Amino acid sequence: MQGMNIAVVGGASGFGLETAKLMVRDGVSKIVVIDINQERLDAAKGELAGKGTEIFTVVRDIARAEGAHASFDAAVKTAGRIRSSICAAIYPRAPLLEITDDMWDAENAINIKGTYHMMVAAVKHMQGHKAEGEVSGRIVNITSVDAFKAHPQNAHYAATKAAVVSLTRSFAHAFAKDQVLINSVAPAGMATEKAKSLGFLGELAAANPLGRAAEPAEIAEFVVMVAGPKNTYMTGEQVIVLGGYIYA
């Protein structure tokens, strides 16, 4: 990924931050981390700095069009041409019969609308760099195995991730002519700090044939591959990384 400029939405913590770390490891030139939380952004910048990559941060709420487009515009202003854009998002839980309107609104705003608006901003930018025989840009959305499997403990999240799978396919089909490659990576449960703090690791291990949750870096490697220069042809695909979970 040397010489590439990357934007990571939701990259100040959790899986997004892990992905940013691997991209820095692989030598990206500039990385722009977009998040709603300034304190987490400051901490993430400290973790990513000092390894040869220029680190920029943008604090924005991407739940509405103006915030999403402003965040991407800021990324371009600070880093120049963005070669790849990665969009990660939230992971709340609620019992199936207790999902409130506020929960639905928050989930839809970030996971569906936010992802949609970030893709619009990225595609418009990448269309401006179309060149014969070259990839104009790459977009990777983080979905979930829950998009393909019943998950009553997390149904609103699963529904939004299924929507993102559909959006990914539609965008990929529409903008293949512009050489913009758009895919998603769908992990099963990961051993993130949040999952650890909520006591989910035992549950995740019991549900997985491999007997453990994935380490975030194991999944992030696939994001790096799909977002990187070795991907010159794949678009509209869902890379499902789940340790056999969906077949259990």
Swiss-Prot record:
* InterPro entries, sorted: NAD(P)-bd_dom_sf (IPR036291), Sc_DH/Rdtase_CS (IPR020904), SDR_fam (IPR002347)
Q: Which keywords annotate this record?
A: Oxidoreductase, Plasmid
Residues at which NADP(+) binds: 8-32
| Pfam families to which the protein is assigned, alphabetical | adh_short_C2 (PF13561)
**Protein name in the entry:** Uncharacterized short-chain type dehydrogenase/reductase y4eL
Which EC number applies? 1.-.-.-
- The answer to whether the entry has keyword Calcium is no
Transferase as a keyword of this entry, yes or no, is no
What class does this enzyme belong to in the EC scheme? Answer: oxidoreductase
Q: Which family does it belong to?
A: Belongs to the short-chain dehydrogenases/reductases (SDR) family.
Among PROSITE patterns, the record links this protein to: ADH_SHORT
